[in-house]
UniProtKB/Swiss-Prot annotation:
Keywords: Carbohydrate metabolism, Cellulose degradation, Glycosidase, Hydrolase, Polysaccharide degradation, Secreted, Signal. It comes from Salmonella typhimurium (strain LT2 / SGSC1412 / ATCC 700720). Pfam families: Glyco_hydro_8 (PF01270). This is Endoglucanase. The active site is at 56 (proton donor), 117 (nucleophile). Belongs to the glycosyl hydrolase 8 (cellulase D) family. GO terms for molecular function: cellulase activity. The gene is bcsZ. NCBIfam families: PRK11097.1. It is an enzyme of class 3 (hydrolase).
Length: 369
């Protein structure tokens, strides 16, 4: 009788554990996999007629898989990326940034140039997957990829120092360089500083990029730096804060409170928080020079600002907007912004002061709060 009782108790404990695991899965991530990721591990953006895949999309999905402790999905994403974007080896090649339907009968790389934002997230995710899952292969590939990024996408800019170019081709001229402030999240820059040069100095030059190019508190999507003249912040149509720059506020908000850079960044970008609180929604576009805003940002912008907003009432307004207008199966970019922002808001992951991932694998699931 006691043996049977122990057996029933064991089964009950197992069923409880299984149910708890099911209840604590990440529903938004599971839905993203169904809507956007092929069985082979390709993240598809259905908004483009060519059904494109980007290195950015692959790298973001690798991060989400790691945060969700989804090892099978991570492996599929990694293998597809390596085989199709990196000529079979992420140790030897930076991934091409764009892949899709070239013509009715051909699916292939559409642009072989690299995109350093995807490369950065991919290297970090591989290194952290190696650490958290104790997978030596991921550590080795992540280390090799990071070295390749340093060789092919990092440049010494007179007057600035080591800077991360947006890609290996097309962003550096004789006396002019083009940068994207959203491409190197500060917490990832902090993480990479353990690898020495050039990463140990990139963290500080990246901070300069973020602080010095936002005169009114709004980060630009893109900005030029010219030798002897500095940042080109004269009013022009292209100097706006919009779909790229929304990630600057997202990354800053997700930084560990103990990182001294966080307070400086939140203070510099406070006008974005103030404007969002005033209007009830984030702006779609802001003129970086004048601070004039226009349009209503999509729901992904609201999700991206959940970690960034420091006022609880302001957070609640954006949280409700995300809940009421959750991205569907045809909104890739809004969906990834939501996985980042809402995922952080739901405590599914955090970053340590060293820039390491602190996942929520072993803790009880919580709702947004």
């Amino acid at each position: 009788m006691m043996t049977m009782l122990r057996g029933w108790i064991t089964m009950l404990v197992m069923l409880t554990a299984i149910n708890a695991q099911a209840a604590c899965s990440w529903p938004a991530w599971e839905q993203f996999k169904k809507d956007y990721i092929s069985q082979q591990g390709r993240v598809i953006d259905p908004g483009d007629a060519r059904k494109i895949t980007t290195s950015e999309g692959q790298s973001y999905a690798m991060f989400f898989a790691l945060a969700a402790n989804d090892r099978p999905a991570f492996a599929q994403l990694f293998n597809w990326t390596q085989n199709n974007l990196a000529q079979g080896s992420l140790r030897e090649y930076l991934p091409a940034w764009l892949w899709g339907q070239k013509d009715p009968d051909t699916w292939s790389v559409l642009d072989s140039n690299s995109a350093s934002d995807g490369d950065i997230w991919m290297a970090w995710s591989l290194l952290e997957a190696g650490r958290l899952w104790k997978e030596t292969r991921y550590t080795e590939v992540g280390t090799a990829l990071l070295k390749r990024i340093a060789r092919e996408e990092v440049l010494n800019v007179p007057g600035l120092g080591s800077m991360l170019l947006p890609g290996k081709i097309g962003f550096a001229e004789a006396n002019s360089w083009r940068f994207n402030p959203s491409y190197l999240p500060p917490q990832l820059a902090q993480y990479f500083s353990r690898f020495g040069a050039p990463w140990s100095t990139l963290r500080e030059t990246n901070l300069r990029l973020l602080l010095e190019t936002a005169p009114k508190g709004f980060s630009p999507d893109w900005v030029r730096y010219e030798s002897k003249q500095g940042w080109q912040l004269k009013a022009e149509k292209t100097l706006i804060s919009s779909y790229d720059a929304i990630r600057v506020y997202l990354w800053a908000g997700m930084m560990h409170d103990g990182d001294p850079q966080k307070a400086r960044l939140l203070a510099r970008f406070k006008p974005m928080a103030t404007l969002t609180m005033k209007n009830g929604v984030p702006p779609e576009k802001v003129d970086v020079v004048s601070g004039n805003a226009q349009g209503t940002g999509p729901v992904g912008f609201s999700a991206a600002l959940l970690p960034f907003l420091q006022n609880r009432d302001a957070q609640a307004v954006q949280r409700q907007r995300v809940a009421d207008h959750f991205p569907g199966s045809d909104a890739y970019y809004n969906y990834v912004l939501t996985l980042f922002g809402q995922g952080w808001d739901q405590h599914r992951f955090r970053f340590t002061v060293k820039g390491e991932l602190l996942p929520d694998w072993g803790q009880e699931c919580v709702s947004s709060r």
